A protein has these predicted regions:
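N-terminal single-pass transmembrane signal-anchor helix
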Residues: 1-37, 41
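Membrane-proximal N-terminal amphipathic helix
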Residues: 37-63
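Phosphate-binding glycine-rich loops and adjacent basic patches that engage nucleotide phosphates
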Residues: 7-16, 54-64
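General N-terminal targeting signals
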Residues: 18, 44-50, 66-68, 72-73
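Periplasmic/extracellular, small/polar-rich flexible segments of pilin-like filament-forming proteins
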Residues: 58-157
């Protein structure tokens, strides 16, 4: 009789079962795409806020109002943007007018001299962007934050 070289049906089934178990265990670690996309969107909004803030500051410097505690500048489309020490004010008349963000993100005033941008459907611990207005001793800043239990954007610890 001739000896056959190869795998039996039982051996193939066992290998397939083992591969299935490994795939179910390892796949979630590699398929965290939704959270990656949300983090990337927040980083994009952060970059837009920072860029808009710098562009408005440049415009304020050209108009000579960068040292004023309260002024306004006109954008290219004749929108008036409120500025504080040259940077957009942390309000809907300031940074919210300076930056253009699609409808999947909302904006709101937070604590004094802060303004936040968050996804419309944001849940607790979701990424958000927190804009802090300029003061006489510090420029405006924008940082990534997290939605807290009160559904407000706060700096990440």
């Amino acid at each position: 009789m001739k000896k056959q070289a190869g795998f039996t049906l039982i051996e193939l089934v066992i290998v397939i079962i083992i591969l299935g178990i490994l795939a179910v265990t390892a796949a979630p670690k590699f398929l965290n795409l939704q959270n990656d996309a949300k983090t990337a969107a927040a980083s994009g909004v952060l970059a837009a806020v920072q860029s808009s803030s710098q562009l408005v500051y440049s415009k304020a410097a050209l108009e000579g109002v960068e040292a004023s505690p309260s002024a306004s500048v006109s954008s290219a489309d004749n929108t008036t943007i409120a500025v504080v020490y040259g940077y957009p004010k942390a309000s809907k008349d300031g940074i919210a007018k300076a930056v253009t963000i699609d409808g999947s993100w909302s904006s709101a005033s937070s604590a004094s001299e802060t303004y936040s941008f968050a996804p419309v459907d944001a849940k607790e611990k979701a990424d958000c962007v927190l804009y802090k207005g300029a003061t006489d001793s510090a420029p405006a800043t924008a940082v990534l934050g997290k939605i807290n239990a009160s559904k407000e954007c706060a700096e990440a610890p």
